[in-house]
Amino acid sequence: MDNILKASLPKLREKLLEALQAVLPIVAIVLVLCFTIAPISPSILLCFLLGAAMILVGIMFFTLGAEMSMSPMGERMGTMLTKTRSLPLIIWVGFLLGFLITISEPDLQVLANQVPSIPNMTLILSVAAGVGLFLVLAFLRMLFGIPLPRLLVLFYSIIFLLAAFVPKEFLAVAFDSGGVTTGPMTVPFIMALGVGVAAIRSDRHAADDSFGLVALCSVGPILAVLILGIAFQASDSTYIPPILPEVNDSVELWQLFREGLPTYFKEIATSLLPIILMFGVFQLVALKLDKRTIGRIAVGLAYTYMGLVLFLTGANVGFMPAGNYLGQVLAGQSFRWVLIPIGMLIGYFIVKAEPAVYVLNKQVEEVTDGAISAQAMGMALSAGVSLSVGLAMVRVLTGVSILWFLIPGYTFAIAISLIVPKLFTAIAFDAGGVASGPMTATFLLPLAQGACVAVGGNIVTDAFGVVAMVAMTPLITVQLMGLIAELKTRKARKAQPAFALAAAYAELPDDAIIEL
């Protein structure tokens, strides 16, 4: 164990540098605003800075921990599950995994509290069942080679059909649920499961189909919440504004964070427990990993736990009040339109601080053998989130319905999926769920809510929906990146001699379907 800890120290330094690159731009933007056009109280500023420090350390531990534990656990479980060649077992275990992981997701409780007309446990169990069912569907898609765009067209058509029967006060929360439930705990594990399942396949489509699990798992909660909204006639959602901190000294400042820590210690322990128990069963029954591998996974789980506790405490106690107050101050100015470019700037950098984004970018680079670099993925995600936050701020200032953005956005994203290489489509729809993580929920959403209060808008219809917008735009930007790459490849092929061109076409993947 000591050797494992020592070996991880150089990696921790590397992860610290990555975390600094992610968090410092956000801190710099907020500080510039605080000292120029958006003055805020010293209490809120100090909470924000201490929260930023905790987020910094949290990202450092989480990214290394997920690399050491969540990814290898998911890959091995996915591989072992597929090796059984037992369809009933894959279905039952897949559903159980999706259900247990989701039911323990901390953000799901927050979502349930926003919809008082539906009993909390009814909503939580329904959303968890939705994720479980769609995780099973994602497994079956990979095993039988079903094209992802077909499923996306089918299910998003059903979603928008159901949306016509749901009260407008409930729409934004329903669409937010898809991004909220694929949090930093579930995403790395679900993505690793996909890589493990695809690893068993020997055909050339395996890499394409190793992504797409998060995409389908994000559909389940939206459908579940929309159906519940119709069944319960859920016409109301609630907005509970964050309590703005007031501290007189450093002891009171630390007291705020110390009171929050036990809550997140408990929440993250509850989230990790189902994953650990399921892995324990796999280890005893089938995996039989050696002690060194188990020790490495155990250290990784400890890092993951510590990192997420620090991250969520810093985000909820430090970032949430600052985001809300900053939104109020900016939208309260005579030049409130400045909220749009500032929101876009914050959106560009804030996605880099999402814990699961690191896992996605690294996995994309590995699975594509460097054809899609982590840096290129990061830029595509940043551009997408920047655009989505800008559009969300337009909604806050104008009160335009979220459907005016979601219907054209998803229609365009699904339309281009028919001509974009399948790998890019799967990655893009996964990226939507990954980008809409806790940083969106604890800073961007409060920013929109604070701005909505300042302009006198309807918070439930105008401010909620930021998560849904952030989940939508990467679908377009990542696929456009794929389309550009494909056009460049075709241009290069045309420039090749005839014999080289023939060889290149011989290497193109066929449409073979895996047999169980």
Question: Which residues make up each language-model segment?
Answer:
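Interfacial loop-to-helix junctions that mark the boundaries of transmembrane helices
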Residues: 13-19, 40-50, 82, 115-124, ...
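Transmembrane helical segments that form the transport core of multi-pass membrane transport proteins
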Residues: 243-356
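Alpha-helical transmembrane segments and their helix-start/interface "positive-inside/aromatic belt" motifs
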Residues: 14-22, 46-52, 80-91, 148-153, ...
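Transmembrane helix-loop junctions in multi-pass membrane proteins
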Residues: 32-46, 66-74, 100-115, 134-146, ...
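Hydrophobic core segments of alpha-helical transmembrane domains in multi-pass membrane transport
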Residues: 24-37, 51-61, 93-100, 130-141, ...
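Juxtamembrane and boundary regions of transmembrane helices in multi-pass small-molecule transporters
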Residues: 2-3, 138-153, 168-169, 173, ...
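Intrinsically disordered, low-complexity non-transmembrane regions of multi-pass membrane transporters
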Residues: 1-19, 23, 74-87, 202-213, ...
